[in-house]
Amino acid sequence: MPRNGAACFKRLAHNLAIRKYLQNNIAIADSTVFQGTLYEHTVVRELSEKLLVKNLEVCGGSYDGGIDIRGKWPVDQIFKTARERFDLSAEFPKKASVNGAQFKPVRHKLDSKSPFRPLNVLVQCKAFKNAKITGKEIRESMGAFSSCVPASRRTQYVLMLSSPNMLTRDGLNVMNGLAIPLVYIRVEMLKSHQGWFDLENSGKLQNYYENEFASKFLQNCGVSQWLKFKLYQSLSQEAVSKTAGGLSGLEASNVN
């Protein structure tokens, strides 16, 4: 399915930002700081294009509290588009309970007549070349989330952890044992091609996985269908302009 002009423009804008970062920092291209920040910019591009996260800001630094990227997630845009193409069941509990925490699924807000307030997104990036994500990294992410978000506001946020590699079994178990909405996204690192970085054919979102809490929190919002059928490629000009701003249950969604 061909990508529409607005979506192309948004991707072009992000690629220009990445190229600018590369040109301004090529002298330190071998450093871990360079690779880490480049990966963060790549994750920003994929979150904006593939999940419509807006107002994305790379904030990694000494005083970031362990959070590398912040943004706003208008899940209602995904829901409206997915609902036009799929039967998103309206059967879901008034309240869900996971690991001792009770909460209302987001779908309740989507079905109400009140304007939907985008979810706050906090992202941690682990630009590991080969290492998989273990329980240790998951616990570190939980610590960063807890230090930034009061317990009373946890259902206004989604924590995302991004890495180029897969989760270990231990990492998966720890992730599903948390009482916060945590989404694991596997985004490739940019690959070299003919002496430069291949921005078009690498650095893509490969997998999206919701822990048990996030799965029930985002139940029947259409995110899995959105990614599985690449609805972001067919988004209308109007929907893209509104959202441009800057794996359910135990099943992981393959994006590409």
Swiss-Prot record:
PANTHER family: REQUIRED FOR RESPIRATORY GROWTH PROTEIN 7, MITOCHONDRIAL. One of its GO terms (molecular function) is nucleic acid binding. It is found in: Mitochondrion. It comes from the Eukaryota. Transmembrane segments: none annotated. Belongs to the RRG7 family. The keyword Mitochondrion applies. This is Required for respiratory growth protein 7, mitochondrial. Keywords: Mitochondrion. GO terms for cellular component: mitochondrion. It comes from Lachancea thermotolerans (strain ATCC 56472 / CBS 6340 / NRRL Y-8284). Its main location: mitochondrion.
